[in-house]
Amino acid sequence: MQLTHLGHSAVLVEVADRRLLIDPGNFSSAWHDVRDLDVILVTHQHPDHVDPEHVGGLIDNNPQAQVWVEPQVLRVVDLPRGEGLAADSSIELGGVAVNAVGGLHAVIHRDIPQIGNVGLVISAEGEPTLFHPGDSLATAPSGVDVLAAPLYGPWAAMKETVDFARAVDATHGFPIHDGLLHERGVKLIYGRLESMTGMEMHDLRDGQPWTVAG
């Protein structure tokens, strides 16, 4: 498995000869020119996870790619094509399995209605298992080797992030959802995750691919 962090919550996953892109949002442009994708995945409708201005171009430039999104995305974002991926469902692509977990975005404020959110568990035989939770810390699937760990959002506090990482109990982690943080904030939460959990953290914000051993 090879992982490339393309800014904020966008992650390119290369595993079992397949290329999957998760959450092409508007806090990053590094994914705009990505080609040869097999799957495009979106955890929820917020624009920092699916950029309504540029996602159509991404889909058009990857005509062979399947597009699977949390079902509410289909109602609020104009996509050239796409299918709904609801919680507790799964898709298979060659030797790669994508399991959707959770169902709801974390609470931002009691006055803001909750929307749908699916965490994504990506696995292939003989490869590490990756968990990208989107914007929720409510579900901690078992058997995760690598956690895409959200560092900060208006829906989370560090104490919750640490407890979430402990519950997932992955061997490796790397930061996502860092677009609202100053560099000092990134280092603070990154350091706490590393020191307060059993997870080995990897800073992938330079956009260079990281190969995870099986």
PLM regions and their residue ranges:
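Core dinuclear metal-dependent hydrolase active-site scaffold
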Residues: M1-R35, G84-G143, W155-E160, R205-G214
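Active-site metal-binding motif and surrounding structural segment of the metallo-beta-lactamase
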Residues: F27-V69, D145-A148
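Catalytic metal-binding/acid-base residues of hydrolase active sites
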Residues: H46, Q72-V73, L104, L137, ...
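Structural motif
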Residues: L21-I22, L41, W68, H132, ...
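Short internal beta-strands
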Residues: P63-Q72, T171-G179
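Binuclear metal-ion centers of metallo-dependent hydrolases, dominated by the metallo-beta-lactamase
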Residues: T4, D78-I91, V162, R166, ...
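A short acidic, amphipathic alpha-helical/loop segment
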Residues: E53-N61, K159-A167, I189
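Conserved alpha/beta-hydrolase "acid-adjacent" motif
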Residues: H49-P52, A157, E183-R184
